[in-house]
Amino acid sequence: AIVIKDSKQITEFKEGILPWSIQNPVALVFDEYDAGRPDVMFVIQRILESEGNFTLLDKNKVLQQHDFFRMFATTNTVGLGDTTGLYHGTQQINQGQMDRWNVVTTLNYLPFEKEMEIILSKNKKMDNKEGKEKVANMIKVADLTRKGFINGDISTVMSPRTVLHWAENYNIFKDVGYAFRVTFLNKCDELEKKIISEYYQRCFGDDLPESSVNIKI
């Protein structure tokens, strides 16, 4: 790091976030862990041991883990690499390292009521009878895309974040169909738009231009 000493700018070694966290009662979370480069991941591997220490070669120093230091990571692929093509840029994680994670759990899509609660908490203007009905239908569309993805019917899926953006865009454009197109449908494969439009029609009772009923033969 560049620091000022005696009115002069000098470069000196400063401990980064990982060495600092190890020595303190900190819960350190690595987001998108499976996007890390393999050479970086090996640095972390030693820390994953139950009493793993961290060596700072620049200072010839060995750091002891604080008793209450904890490390967490989030991934999209559980370390197995991207088999779907949805998470380009992720890496396979060394199985020796995966073996050192003593707890692994999966967070699936939220229950309907919880997803509804989150969307409404971020969109206060829709926290009324009409708004709740629209949000409920948005979540139903999202659920159909998730089932369609699992069944192999479509290759793009709506996450809770997508539903949140859809609700936000509805508040801007005041048109639920247009908001759906610019939020999600425009990101989808042309060959799948008809299927996704059918999902929308089932939940809202309205046809989008991409729907099969509007396709002229």
List each model region and its residues.
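C-terminal regulatory/interaction module of P-loop NTP-utilizing enzymes
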Residues: 1-217
